[in-house]
Amino acid sequence: MSSSENICVVIPAFREAGRIGAVVRAVRAQGLAVVVVDDGSPDATGAEAAAAGATVLRHATNRGKGAALHTAYACAREHGYDAVITMDGDGQHDPADLPALLAAARTTGAPVDVGNRMADAAAMPRVRRWTNRGMSWLLGRVMRQQVPDTQCGFRYYRLAVLPTQPPGSTRYAAESELLLDLAARGVPIASAPVRTIYRDEQSKINPVVDTLRFLGMMLRRAVRRR
């Protein structure tokens, strides 16, 4: 990335009232614009994000994280941004790591930098640690380039490399599918260490259901290649 890049932070959010406002304020304090896609939340997620200084787009119904990110990328393009950083809205991704992620993107020059939580994964719930490592290993084999933490949603993307068509997977598997698409096109993918803040709230990720969706996505791609 260049020092003159115009960058915004995009946050897909579903039922994040009570958390999203603090995330947006922490990002805005660093001088970055924020686009939040309220993915059909029944609570005050969108209102809290707007009050904290974000541009808020809303899906009338819950369409999934992949669909929300696609909406955010389209908005960033329309507003002339060169690159985006994706973050979760629940506070797990520490906005204090934004400068480090941007510095890594400048250092590597890669159009994609994926956060790596695995260097300090002790606080990660054990099941998620195992599934993350397994998915990252499998994706790395298919991609033919190693990304230590393919399941981390704290990422830097240059918009020019992102597809403009909607993702085949609209939920959590969409981020893995995107990495596969980028690797297939020969796009370099770098990594940068980031922290994750785990709280007592139940994760929206279902290890069984979302792992099955991930495997289903991998199977569909394998069938299409034959």
Protein language model regions, located:
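Catalytic donor-sugar/metal-binding loop of nucleotide-sugar-dependent glycosyltransferases
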Residues: 145-146, 167-170, 179-196
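Short hydrophobic beta-strand elements that form part
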Residues: 8-12, 58
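Short, well-formed alpha-helical segments that are part of the catalytic scaffolds
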Residues: 13-29
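Short beta-strand-to-loop acidic/aromatic patch adjacent to the donor-nucleotide binding site
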Residues: 81-92
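Acceptor/aglycone-binding surface of glycosyltransferases and processive sugar-polymer synthases
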Residues: 61-78, 95-172, 198-209, 213-219
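Acidic helix N-cap motif at the loop->helix transition within catalytic regions
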Residues: 18-22, 43-52
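A conserved acidic beta->alpha catalytic loop
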Residues: 38-47, 91
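Cell-envelope/extracellular polymer assembly enzymes that use nucleotide-activated donors
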Residues: 6-8, 177
